[in-house]
Structure formats: C-alpha cells, structure tokens
C-alpha cells in the first residue's frame, strides 16, 4: 500500500513538473472572409457564382499580393461537386491553384537590368520558380530589397538563412570592389564589380544543378558606390535579391500536401485538389495544407467558417483588409485585423470610406470608425457556475473590456481569457501577463481549500480562500474600486478546479482565467484625437470617430488612420486608386542567428548620407524588429524567480520528490 501511494505520488509530481514547464507559443491568425449559411451549398450559392466560391489575395490577407502591380497568384475555391452537402466538401471540391506572375524588383531600375522577375505564391509563402515558365521547381524568396547597406572590407552582410556577402577588397582607385558570396560560411562564388560610368554595377550569381536546372540566378547585387579612404575601404550596396536555392524543391504529381493530394502541373500553373471528402467539423480547425486551415464555428444551428493561416515565427506581420478601389466599408468579415468571435458570430468594429468621387481625397466626415459593445462567451464557458458571457469592444483592432458594460467611454485591454488548465504548487506564481500574477499561498490540510494571492508588478492587490467542496462555484472574483472613477469593477476571475494536499506537495489546479489590464484603463473624451480621426461621439454602447479635416490617400504611401491602423495605397496612375486598411501584429522572441558567434559579421544599415557601422539586418520590405506587442498572452506556468539559465523551482522540487519516493520504495522493500 505504501509503495502504491509512493508511486502514485511520483506520477502526479512528474505530471506536474511537465505541466509547469509547458507554455503556449504566441500565434497570429490571419483569416479570410467569414462565410455563414445553413449548409455548404447555401454558402456557395450566397457568396460564390457558377457553383464555385473562390478566395484570392484581395480578400485573404495570407495570400501573396503586390498592391502596386495588383498582382495575385493564389486562389482557394470550394466547388459544388457531387458529395458536397451539409458540412462536407466532396472529392475534388477544394481547389488550390497558383500561377506564376511577373512582379517588379523592389530596386526597380529597368535601365540597369532590374525590371521584373517571376514569382509564385505557394500556400501563402513567396517562392521563385527555378524555370520561369514552369511551376514544378520552386525556391523560397529570401530577400528583395532596395535599402542601402554600407559595408567595410573584411565585413560580412548577413542576408538571412545562412547566406552572406563579404567585401574582400576595394581597389586603390576606388572604382571596383571584390565581393564574396557564402552559405553557412562556405564559399559559393566571388566577383569583382566595377562602378565606373557605363557599367550596370550588378553582380548576378548563376549556379548549376539546382533541381537539375543550370544557369539559375540565385543572387543579384547592385553596388551603388565604392570608397577608398585613408582609414576605411567601403562599398555601398543598393539592390539585393536572393533565393534559398539550397532548399529548392521539386513538386511531383504524386505529392501530398495535407488534405490536398491530387497534384496537376500545367506549365506555369499548379493545381492541387482533395481526393477524399473534407469535413468542416464544428468547433475545430481542419488543416487544408501547409499551414492553411478552415476554422469552423461551434454552432449547430448554422455553418460558419473561414480560411486562415497560423503564424508562430517571431516577427511583425501585416494583417490587411479587402482591397478597395473607391468608396468601401470594412468589418470583421472582410478585415482580419478587426476583433471577431466566430463561435458567437460577434464583431464590433467597422470602418467606412465615402465621398471619394473618383479621386483620392476623403472629405470631412467621410472616414468613419465605429465600434459597439457586444456580449461574448467566456473561453471557459460554464453558465451553471457563473461563467457565461462578458461585454467586449474592439478598439482599433484590439480587444477591450468596457468598465461599464453599457458605456463605451471607459476601456481596459483584455489580457487573458483562457480555459486551459494550469497546475501550481504552494509558493509558486502563475504569470498572467502584463505584470499580473497569482500565487498559491497555502492549501488546507483537508485538501478542500486554497489560499490565492493576486499581485501586480510584485505588489499585493487582493487575496482569497477558495473552497472546492461540492456546492461551491469554486470561482474567485477580484473587484476593485476607483477604476476610472468606477467602483466594484471585476478585474480578475479565477476558477479553481481541484486542490491536492499530499505528503510532499500541495497543489491547486486552475481551469478558467479572465483578466483585464485595469492598471492601464483609459477614458475616452469627446475632445480626444486618434491620429487623423478627431471627431469623437459616444452614444451609450457605441463609439463613433470621424475626420474633421480632409484625408488624402497619398499614392505609394502608408497613411495612418489612428492608433496603429493604416491605409496602404498603391503606386498607381492619377486616374486609378487602390488601397486597403491594415494593422501590424507582433510575435515576440528572438530569431536564431546562425552566425552569431562570428565577430566579423556586419548587419546592414540603411544609410543615405554618411558612413556608419552597419547595424540593420535586411528583410523583405521594411525592416521590422520584433517588439513587445499588445497581444493577449497565454499564462506561462513558471515560478517568477526562475530564469533562462537555471532550472525552475518546480523542476528542482520535482526531482527532489522523485528521489525521496525512490528512497521510500527501496526502504519498504
């Protein structure tokens, strides 16, 4: 009996150790249009045409799109084929198709040979066809940049994915530079580039045997200037283009991509369909292929779903709305940045442009942002114990909670709404994000109650003893006063699932957490300004903000609307207009640098006026460093005193406990 108890305790401790060590990664979801109907055929009839529902890049922000050239390559279609009924898509009813297109280099200089190149979107990633007319051999695009980078001789310019170029030497006349191209530190090619008048200043690296293709251009470098000084020898690069040729792939007709397994290649077009039926399972995410999913609502009365792509890599990402060419209106169904609850079919925000009249100037009052408080279910949805619904308000693409459920003037950001299970020992803290934490102080000897403490930035806020005996709701609500002059404001809800008092460990299991950032709550006044939106009206549960002055959609520019929301406007002729709204979302974390141990690696710097030590790493398009974003965090079950170099308290305690159990078992033998 003693051995059984000891082994059982060991198993529980081991489970707890691993539960404490686990934490959910941040995820950005880029969704397509929301489709809602009685069944799949009703949705195709309502939103599609000719028995087909088709999504392209103008509607689905994950697909590749060049707004300046209005170029898309990918489409995802649902067809009304035999077997398509209810929530089932028949065989061959999902069609993913992508076609090679020509796009301009970011460094656009046709006279110098930098005009356009072949590109194909492949499951929402940018690829380059090895053969510009065939879609079967592809390499990912690593870099397409028109930034200026300055490097000294002996320094390397990190291009990403292990590729780099080094300025070996500059000639004494300052007219030529010797560049070397490497992959993972290994030599690939080198060239002496002249910058004298009449030369195109461009180095093209051509390699053979890339997926059995020869003379494949894998790198293009345009050298702008060369400088030979008394101290420094410097090359200035403007124009970089690179493909990941070492990981090029060949697509075969018998390849499978998730649930898409019927591959057809017809010249520059790649088509992939499903050989088996595909079920849109309610309250689930079903992978289509290669990180693309259909997300379906938990609603038995209707069929509601959207296509989406999940991103987990650290970085900053643009989430855009549907592309417009004149007056337009966006809500959560066509702008993925806006808050949307698919299960409850709840959205709160809209953005409307009127009065363009063929031009690019929005008149006074023609730009209207509006948001209205709505009720949504808790993630931990248990109405019988008081976890039913709460009020929410999207505010410039972020999720906020109104301090007063009926007024949209006082808001606090939603930090956490989770139904995950978290196990903490006494003395340990559960980090809730934004400096908030709860700690299990003690468990009573009968294992029926736990004493929890709530803190902000390490300072005491409140505490409570929660009972888990039959008949109690096991929920702790923290109510605070004077939150933007409001009293009895619920700022935290915690549901305790179980309490365990063992010989070694005292443990509380939490399932159900809801938290608002009350410390940074804000009040919106009628004279507030949000970017170019400066006419604020609050009418009960609805907040409306418009522009008092005219608003110009400047071509080839990003124009801020307000609070980090922008319009991106295409570089078109004066007679045309093309634009979309977007926000940026960030996943925190460090990007692994393969060359971080090299002391002589130079990261690029964008520098037009003077020579400086390069510090900027090139990326496709604008350089974006990951920053601490305002996104909702999942709790990480780590003691706050643990750091990245030493084991957490939970792990050490678990190991000590296991050794003790082994000792007890051996002694009992």
Swiss-Prot record:
**Where do the record's glycosylation annotations fall on this chain?**
36, 70, 116, 600, 607
Q: Where is the composition biased (Acidic residues)?
A: 590-627
Where is the region Disordered? 588-648
Sorted alphabetically, the keyword list is:
Cell membrane, Cell wall, Cell wall biogenesis/degradation, Glycoprotein, Membrane, S-layer, Secreted, Signal, Transmembrane, Transmembrane helix
One Pfam family name is PGF-CTERM
Q: Which cysteines are joined by disulfide bonds?
A: none
Q: What does the record list as GO biological process?
A: cell wall organization
TM region(s), chain numbering: 645-665
Post-translational changes noted in the entry: Glycosylated.
Annotated Gene Ontology cellular component terms: extracellular region; plasma membrane; S-layer
Question: What's the main place this protein lives?
Answer: secreted
Task: Tell me if Oxidoreductase is a UniProt keyword of this record.
Answer: no
Cleaved signal peptide residues: 1-24
InterPro entries per the record? PGF_CTERM, S_layer-rel_Mac
Q: Where in the cell is it found?
A: Secreted, Cell wall, S-layer; Cell membrane
Q: Which NCBIfam families match?
A: PGF_CTERM, S_layer_rel_Mac
Q: What does this protein do?
A: S-layer protein. The S-layer is a paracrystalline mono-layered assembly of proteins which coat the surface of the cell.
Q: Which family does it belong to?
A: Belongs to the Methanosarcinales S-layer protein family.
Q: What is this protein called?
A: Major S-layer protein
The species is Methanosarcina mazei (strain ATCC BAA-159 / DSM 3647 / Goe1 / Go1 / JCM 11833 / OCM 88)
């Amino acid at each position: 009996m003693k051995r059984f108890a000891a082994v059982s305790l060991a198993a529980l401790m081991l489970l707890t150790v691993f539960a404490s060590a686990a934490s959910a990664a941040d995820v950005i979801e880029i969704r397509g249009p929301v489709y809602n109907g009685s069944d799949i055929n009703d949705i195709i009839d309502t939103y599609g045409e000719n028995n087909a529902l088709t999504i392209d890049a103008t509607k689905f922000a994950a697909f590749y799109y060049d707004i300046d050239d209005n170029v898309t390559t990918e489409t995802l279609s649902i067809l009304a084929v035999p077997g398509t009924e209810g929530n089932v898509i028949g065989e061959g009813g999902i069609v993913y198709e992508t076609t090679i297109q020509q796009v301009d280099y970011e460094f656009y200089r046709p006279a110098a040979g930098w005009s356009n190149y072949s590109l194909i979107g492949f499951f929402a990633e940018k690829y380059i066809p090895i053969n510009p007319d065939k879609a079967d051999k592809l390499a990912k695009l690593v870099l397409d940049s028109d930034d200026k980078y300055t490097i000294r001789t002996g320094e390397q310019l990190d291009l990403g994915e292990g590729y780099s170029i080094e300025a070996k030497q500059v000639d004494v006349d300052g007219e030529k530079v010797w560049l070397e191209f490497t992959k993972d530190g290994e030599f690939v090619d080198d060239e002496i580039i002249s910058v004298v008048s009449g030369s195109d200043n461009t180095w093209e690296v051509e390699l053979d045997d890339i997926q059995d293709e020869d003379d494949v251009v894998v790198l293009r470098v345009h050298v702008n200037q060369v400088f030979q000084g008394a101290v420094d020898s410097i090359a200035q690069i403007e124009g970089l283009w690179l493909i990941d040729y070492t990981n090029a792939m060949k697509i075969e007709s018998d390849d499978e991509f998730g649930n898409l397994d019927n591959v057809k290649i017809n010249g520059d077009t790649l088509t992939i369909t499903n050989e088996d039926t595909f079920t849109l399972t309610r309250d689930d995410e079903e992978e289509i292929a290669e990180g693309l999913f259909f997300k379906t609502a938990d609603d038995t009365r209707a069929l509601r779903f959207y296509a989406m792509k999940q991103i987990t890599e650290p970085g900053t990402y643009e989430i855009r709305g549907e592309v417009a060419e004149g007056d337009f209106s966006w809500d959560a169904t066509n702008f993925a940045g806006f808050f949307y609850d698919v299960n409850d079919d709840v959205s709160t925000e809209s953005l409307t442009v009127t009065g363009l009249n063929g031009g690019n100037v929005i008149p006074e009052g023609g730009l209207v942002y509006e948001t209205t408080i709505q009720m949504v279910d808790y993630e931990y949805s248990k109405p019988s114990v008081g976890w039913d619904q709460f009020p929410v308000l999207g505010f410039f693409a972020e999720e906020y909670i109104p301090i007063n459920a009926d007024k949209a003037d006082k808001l606090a950001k939603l930090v956490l709404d989770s139904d995950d299970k978290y196990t903490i020992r006494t003395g340990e803290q559960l980090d809730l994000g934004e400096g908030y934490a709860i700690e299990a102080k003690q468990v009573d000897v009968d294992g029926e109650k736990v004493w929890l403490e709530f803190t902000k930035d390490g300072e005491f806020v409140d505490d409570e003893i929660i009972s888990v005996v039959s008949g109690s709701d096991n929920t702790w609500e923290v109510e605070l006063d004077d939150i933007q002059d409001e009293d009895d404001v619920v700022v935290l809800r915690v549901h305790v699932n179980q309490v365990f008092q063992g010989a070694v460990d005292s443990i509380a299991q939490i399932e159900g957490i809801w938290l608002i950032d009350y410390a940074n709550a804000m009040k919106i006044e009628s004279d507030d300004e949000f970017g170019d939106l400066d006419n604020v009206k609050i009418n009960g549960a609805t907040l409306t903000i418009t522009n008092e002055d005219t608003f110009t959609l400047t071509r080839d520019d990003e124009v801020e609307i307000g609070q980090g929301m922008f319009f991106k406007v295409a570089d078109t002729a004066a007679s045309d207009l093309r634009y979309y709204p977007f926000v940026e979302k960030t996943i925190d974390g460090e990007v692994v640098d393969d060359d971080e141990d090299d002391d002589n690696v130079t990261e690029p710097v964008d520098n037009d006026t003077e020579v400086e030590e390069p510090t900027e790493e090139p990326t496709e398009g604008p350089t974006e460093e990951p920053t601490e974003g305002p996104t909702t965090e999942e709790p990480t079950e780590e003691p706050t005193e643990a750091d990245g170099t030493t084991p957490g308290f939970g792990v050490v305690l678990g190991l000590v406990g296991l050794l003790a159990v082994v000792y007890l078992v051996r002694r009992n033998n």
